[in-house]
C-alpha cells in the first residue's frame, strides 16, 4: 500500500474534521444474512466492532476475542446464519465491505434492520485507518495483494484483495463522471452539480466508481467457480457534500438518494456484503483536531502482535516450543480452546479445541466443533460423513431397486396367467 494513500487519508480526514469536529452518534452496520430485531438491535463498542469485522474478513487471528466481549454473541449469530456445510458444497463468492460516510441508518433498506450499531461512532478517518490495518493483515495471510482500483484526494478509496487476479484502476475525468451521472439519474439532477467545485467532483467520481463496481460484481456473481476476492471501500463524497452545502440542501438530498440506489444495486449482485453507515457529522462539536487525532488512534483499540505463526516451532514443525509461543501465534487458539502440552513430549504445545454452543431464533441450541492448528475452522467431519454415507447408501438402494424391478420384468408369467383357453361352463 503506497505512502500516497496514507497521506491522502490524513489530509482528507483533516479537511472534514476541521469543518465539523468529532461526532459521537451511532453508526449502523448492515450484513448479509444477519438482521437485528426491530426493537432490539444490539449496540457494541468500536473495539468490539473491530473484532466482528475481523471475523467477517477472515483476519480474526490478529485480534484477541475476550470471553465476555460484546462481539462474541454477534459472531456466534454469524456462524449460525452462514452454514459452513453449505459453503463446502457451493462455490464461495466475493465479499464486499464498504464504509459510507454521511448516510444515516433510517435512509437505507426499509425492510432490513441493522445487524448492530456502533456506539460513540469514530470518524471516517478512523475507519479508513482500520481498513488499512485489515488490508495489511489480509496480505500477510495469503501472500496476496490488495490493489487500489479507485482513489480520490479526500480519502475515498475502493480496493480489491485477491491472491490471483490482476485489476486495472478506475480512471475518469470530471466531464466523463458528470456525463455518466446524467445517463444514470437524468439531466435535471446532473444540472445541480458543478464540476468546478471539489466536493462535487469527488462525489461524481465515487458514483462512477460504484457503477463500475456493480458491473464487476455482477460479472463475478455469474461465474460458477469459487471467488475469494474481497472488495474494501471507503466512500466520503456524500459527507463532503454534507459539509459543503448542509443536510437540508437539495444537492445533498439528491446525492443521498443516488448513493442509496447504488448500494441497493450492490446488495443485489453481491452474495456477501457489509455496509457501515456513518451518520453525518454534528457540526456543533468543538473538539480540537489534536484531540480528534488522539481519539482516531485509540478508537478501535489494539490488535495483537501482527504475526502469523512466526513464533518458533520444534524440530518437526508441528508443535510450539512453549505455551506462550502457542498462545501468541494462534491468538489463544482463536478463542475456541487453549494451548496445552502434547502427550509426554518436551517443548511441544498445541491447541486443544473446545466446542461452542449457540442458540438459533427458535431458542434451540447448536453445538459448533472447532478444528485446525489454531481452532479457527469449523469441524464438519460428522456432517460430511453423515451426508456422504447417506448419499452412498441411498444411491445403492436406488440401483438395487432398479435391478430388482428389471429382473422381475424378465421372468415368464405363470401358466394360469398366460393361458388363453376359454373356460366353458357345463350344464346338466
From Swiss-Prot:
Cellular component aspect of the GO annotation: endoplasmic reticulum; endoplasmic reticulum membrane
Protein name: Uncharacterized endoplasmic reticulum membrane protein C1709.03
Membrane-crossing residue ranges in chain numbering: 386-406
Segments on the Cytoplasmic side according to the record's topology features: 407-428
Principal place of residence: endoplasmic reticulum
Signal peptide: 1-19
Bilayer topology annotation: Single-pass membrane protein
GO biological process: vesicle-mediated transport
Cell compartments where the protein resides: Endoplasmic reticulum membrane
Lumenal compartment spans: 20-385
Origin superkingdom: Eukaryota
Keywords associated with the record: Endoplasmic reticulum, Membrane, Signal, Transmembrane, Transmembrane helix
Amino acid at each position: 500500500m503506497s505512502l500516497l494513500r496514507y497521506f491522502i487519508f490524513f489530509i482528507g480526514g483533516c479537511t472534514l474534521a476541521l469543518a465539523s469536529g468529532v461526532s459521537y452518534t451511532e453508526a449502523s452496520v448492515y450484513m448479509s444474512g444477519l438482521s437485528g430485531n426491530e426493537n432490539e438491535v444490539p449496540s457494541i463498542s468500536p473495539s468490539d466492532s473491530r473484532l466482528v469485522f475481523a471475523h467477517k474478513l477472515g483476519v480474526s487471528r490478529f485480534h484477541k476475542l475476550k470471553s465476555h466481549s460484546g462481539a462474541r454473541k454477534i459472531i456466534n449469530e454469524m456462524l449460525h446464519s452462514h452454514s459452513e456445510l453449505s459453503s463446502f458444497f457451493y462455490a464461495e463468492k466475493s465479499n464486499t465491505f464498504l464504509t459510507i460516510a454521511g448516510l444515516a441508518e433510517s435512509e437505507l433498506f426499509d425492510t432490513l434492520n441493522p445487524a448492530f450499531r456502533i456506539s460513540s461512532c469514530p470518524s471516517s478517518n478512523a475507519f479508513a485507518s482500520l481498513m488499512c490495518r485489515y488490508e495489511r493483515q489480509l496480505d500477510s495471510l495469503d501472500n496476496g495483494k490488495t490493489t487500489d482500483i479507485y482513489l480520490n484526494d479526500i480519502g475515498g478509496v475502493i480496493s480489491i484483495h485477491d491472491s490471483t487476479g490482476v485489476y486495472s484502476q478506475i480512471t475518469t475525468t470530471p466531464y466523463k463522471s458528470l456525463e455518466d451521472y446524467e445517463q444514470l439519474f437524468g439531466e435535471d439532477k446532473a444540472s445541480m452539480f458543478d464540476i468546478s467545485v471539489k466536493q462535487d467532483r469527488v462525489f461524481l467520481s465515487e458514483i462512477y466508481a460504484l457503477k463500475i463496481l456493480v458491473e464487476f460484481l455482477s460479472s463475478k456473481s455469474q461465474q460458477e467457480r469459487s471467488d475469494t476476492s474481497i472488495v474494501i471501500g471507503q466512500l466520503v463524497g456524500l459527507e463532503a457534500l454534507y459539509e459543503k452545502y448542509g443536510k437540508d440542501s437539495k444537492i445533498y438530498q439528491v446525492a443521498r438518494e443516488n448513493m442509496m440506489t447504488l448500494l441497493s444495486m450492490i446488495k443485489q449482485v453481491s452474495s456477501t456484503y457489509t455496509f457501515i453507515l456513518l451518520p453525518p457529522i454534528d457540526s456543533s462539536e468543538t473538539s480540537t483536531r489534536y484531540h480528534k487525532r488522539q481519539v482516531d488512534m485509540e478508537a478501535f483499540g489494539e490488535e495483537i502482535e501482527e504475526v502469523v505463526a512466526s513464533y518458533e516451532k520444534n524440530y518437526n514443525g508441528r508443535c510450539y516450543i512453549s505455551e506462550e509461543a502457542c498462545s501468541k501465534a494462534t491468538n489463544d487458539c482463536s478463542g475456541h480452546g487453549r494451548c496445552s502440552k502434547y502427550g509426554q513430549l518436551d517443548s511441544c504445545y498445541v491447541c486443544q479445541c473446545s466446542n461452542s454452543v449457540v442458540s438459533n431464533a427458535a431458542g434451540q441450541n447448536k453445538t459448533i466443533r472447532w478444528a485446525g492448528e489454531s481452532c479457527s475452522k469449523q469441524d464438519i467431519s460428522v456432517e460430511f460423513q453423515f451426508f456422504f454415507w447417506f448419499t452412498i447408501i441411498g444411491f445403492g438402494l436406488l440401483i438395487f431397486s432398479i435391478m430388482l424391478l428389471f429382473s422381475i420384468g424378465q421372468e415368464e408369467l405363470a401358466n394360469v396367467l398366460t393361458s388363453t383357453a376359454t373356460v366353458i361352463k357345463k350344464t346338466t
